[in-house]
Swiss-Prot record:
Gene responsible for this protein: gcvT
Subunit architecture: The glycine cleavage system is composed of four proteins: P, T, L and H.
GO molecular function, one term: transaminase activity
Keywords assigned by UniProt, alphabetized: Aminotransferase, Transferase
Name of the featured protein: Aminomethyltransferase
Organism ancestry: Bacteria, Pseudomonadati, Pseudomonadota, Gammaproteobacteria, Enterobacterales
Record-stated family: Belongs to the GcvT family.
Amino acid sequence: MAQQTPLYEQHTLCGARMVDFHGWMMPLHYGSQIDEHHAVRTDAGMFDVSHMTIVDLRGSRTREFLRYLLANDVAKLTKSGKALYSGMLNASGGVIDDLIVYYFTEDFFRLVVNSATREKDLSWITQHAEPFGIEITVRDDLSMIAVQGPNAQAKAATLFNDAQRQAVEGMKPFFGVQAGDLFIATTGYTGEAGYEIALPNEKAADFWRALVEAGVKPCGLGARDTLRLEAGMNLYSQEMDETISPLAANMGWTIAWEPADRDFIGREALEAQREHGTEKLVGLVMTEKGVLRNELPVRFTDVQGNQHEGIITSGTFSPTLGYSIALARVPEGIGETAIVQIRNREMPVKVTKPVFVRNGKAVA
């Protein structure tokens, strides 16, 4: 039986089409995925992300533990509330999960991990935390709502009290603050400004209804996927998994190679991969009629005349741009164009950086 978030009833009241998403009943859309997508790009939309797992870590050696557990380096986190995006890797350099870590105090950090990877993440974290004496608390008492779009922060702020408004005033991206019973973070998965707000389960439904009344449009998983793909943001199990290096998933920037003496899980394997080279993640744009879909082959000939083949990891029609876009994992040596096989047709595509839209504007 699939689990329900505390907002399940609100979704049905809003007319959602519900689907099973990794064991959770979640809204796919509320009538029009396209309208929901455009609401986030032009105004404000919101997503129930209560299926995500919030994990609090406490103990005097928490920073030391996270410097070992994660490929990015929490030594960078010196200001309370600052957040960091990182891969959590296995010994062979594959990605167990991608996550966000928040620093509050020297003995208190918070992780937000994916729902699909919840059980293996918790098992891995618990196993490696034991020698460090870390106290692990899974915050199943909290729901989370992501409010995203150019007007999202202003509309969400109409629900805040004076102290909460003051707490978030001037807050830069990738920060979080506990303000009353709300944990408000300037993070998201859409390429737009906004907040991800964690709050007690029993208060979630009222908060959701108040956001609807403030003019924030409920949005489902369909729009969440097209928005994150336009923004060039990875989806676990598509762009990366335990067999794929972060170097092949456009996550090289999340690996803190320095200081060279920091030992983190997967480091040795990553250094070998860096030396020998890996595949890479690129963007694809197709302005011809048709849609680039997951798992379609991507073919190109390198400058030496050798033929290569890669694969589309995520593809869709972009509502913002009006044509098809994709992320693809391909061998090194790809040029500015490639061919994608769609049924029995060879379609030309332009190769770009793996990001297409930022703050509502095309970058590809």
